[in-house]
């Protein structure tokens, strides 16, 4: 009985803390609405009277004399669904697609781009990348596309870019009366799983510089891997999500939760080896998507060269080669600490810088550079996905194969080299290497 009471008390305390946290979030969101003049979604009222104002009649001469009218309060005028405090808009609830209203989209946009607790913008930074001293300047030959314009006016799309034959030919952003007042060319937006593909691209550079062997090398020289499920595993199996680890992730949420229930994204590789994968053996190697393997491989690169040299590698890729215009950064997991510091593959960047990264991959492929040969080797070593991922709505389901943290094998063009970087919520960058075309979308 005593244990039940303790559990009940802890539950009630947690519920109370969550309610306080949500009230604080709404208060900050309301201030942001005022700052950005979203006038339809707030109104000004008066807060609870304090001091002398408690005993004075509202709007009386004495009430004004004592400045009681200065105690203003911003009151939200919106219908926001917080999905029980979820840090992201869920894609499905009980098997049905979620259709968030405008106010909810606006609220989550605010959460995504501002230093609010629980989101990437406010997460500890593992590495900062400064703007390039030699920014790549795009060429433009813009054309009007009525369909794309219409979608920008009624959907959660923030940005749409079409790059072909060396030029940007479609460049659309959310209009001012939707999200255009707050989403600009300077807004850093989260990558979500696009970071997986970028981790692969970084790995390719590390291989080309001789820091890492090749995609058939094993990662046995990393001490934390000893006696774990990933000992004796080839890099190609890890980056193809075919490490035989599917039995040790949650059946209900294999991307984000271990079988133990702990978070995948917020665990360092060392802690994962100690608590999730020690003394385990791999099962049959098949495609099994999760968020851990990209973190594992990116931190392996850091282990191989050290943090200082890793910063140099990142600067070479993003500042010297890609030529990013704005700064960007990668974040750390919550459990990262001195002595066990690690990076996530999640990063934040601006819309044109995302396109610059995609263009660099396209250039490497077409110029047959060492990194281009690496990308081609991924395509040659691609593996089939499983039927459980199939659907007709997104790149997960529309692609039949997986190539080193890239989706590929689109229906109707399975044998063509088209790579897709896909991030939760609508960060999708599709590179058609044969036709020199990139489609880049960013959404809430």
Region annotations inferred by a language model:
Residues 324-326, 331, 381-438:
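Active-site Gly/Thr loop motif
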Residues 293-300, 345-367, 427-443:
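Active-site-proximal alpha-helical segments within enzyme catalytic domains
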Residues 1-19:
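Classical Sec-dependent N-terminal signal peptides that target proteins to the secretory pathway
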Residues 17-181, 212, 240:
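N-terminal leader/targeting segments and the immediately adjacent pre-domain N-terminus
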Residues 208-246, 305-344, 349, 366:
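Active-site helix/loop module of the DD-peptidase/beta-lactamase fold
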Residues 149-150, 179-185, 190-191, 206-286:
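Active-site-proximal loop and beta-strand segments within enzyme catalytic domains
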Residues 166, 187-214, 238, 297-301, ...:
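Active-site SXXK
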Residues 173, 185-186, 250-335, 341-345:
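Catalytic-site signature segments of enzymes, centered on catalytic residues
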């Amino acid at each position: 009985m005593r244990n039940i009471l303790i559990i009940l008390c802890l539950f009630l305390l947690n519920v109370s803390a969550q309610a306080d946290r949500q009230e604080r979030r709404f208060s900050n969101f309301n201030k942001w609405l005022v700052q950005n003049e979203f006038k339809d979604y707030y109104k000004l009222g008066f807060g609870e009277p304090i001091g002398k104002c408690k005993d004075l009649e509202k709007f009386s001469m004495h009430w004004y004399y004592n400045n009681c009218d200065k105690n203003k309060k911003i009151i939200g005028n919106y219908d926001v669904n917080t999905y029980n405090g979820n840090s992201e808009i869920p894609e499905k609830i009980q098997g049905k697609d979620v259709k968030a209203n405008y106010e909810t989209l606006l609220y989550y946009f605010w959460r995504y781009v501002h230093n609010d607790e629980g989101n990437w913008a406010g997460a500890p930074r593992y590495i900062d990348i400064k703007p390039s001293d030699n920014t790549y300047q795009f060429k433009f030959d813009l054309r009007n596309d009525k369909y794309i314009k219409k979608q920008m006016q009624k959907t959660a799309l923030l940005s749409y870019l079409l790059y072909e034959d060396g030029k940007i030919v479609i460049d659309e952003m959310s209009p001012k009366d939707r999200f255009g007042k707050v989403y600009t060319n300077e807004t850093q937006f989260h990558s979500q799983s696009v970071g997986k593909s970028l981790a692969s691209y970084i790995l390719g550079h590390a291989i080309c510089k001789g820091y890492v062997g090749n995609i058939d090398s094993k990662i046995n020289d990393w001490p934390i891997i000893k006696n774990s499920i990933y000992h004796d595993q080839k890099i190609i199996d890890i980056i193809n999500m075919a490490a035989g680890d599917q039995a040790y992730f949650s059946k209900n949420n294999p991307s984000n939760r271990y079988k133990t229930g702990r978070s995948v994204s917020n665990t360092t590789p060392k802690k994962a080896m100690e608590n999730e994968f020690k003394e385990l053996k791999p099962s049959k190697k098949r495609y099994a998507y999760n968020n851990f393997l990209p973190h594992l491989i990116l931190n392996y690169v850091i282990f191989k060269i050290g943090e200082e040299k890793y910063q140099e590698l990142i600067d070479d890729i993003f500042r010297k080669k890609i030529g990013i215009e704005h700064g960007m950064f990668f974040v750390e997991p919550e459990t990262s600490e001195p002595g066990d510091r690690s990076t996530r593959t999640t990063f934040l960047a601006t819309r044109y810088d995302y396109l610059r990264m995609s263009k660099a991959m396209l250039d490497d492929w077409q110029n047959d550079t060492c990194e281009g040969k690496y990308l081609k080797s991924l395509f040659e070593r691609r593996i089939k996905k499983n039927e459980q991922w199939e659907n007709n709505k997104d790149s997960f389901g529309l692609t039949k194969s997986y190539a080193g943290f890239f989706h590929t094998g689109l229906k109707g063009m399975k044998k063509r080299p088209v790579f897709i970087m896909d991030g939760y919520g609508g960060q999708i960058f599709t590179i058609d290497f044969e036709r020199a075309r990139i489609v880049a979308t960013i959404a809430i």
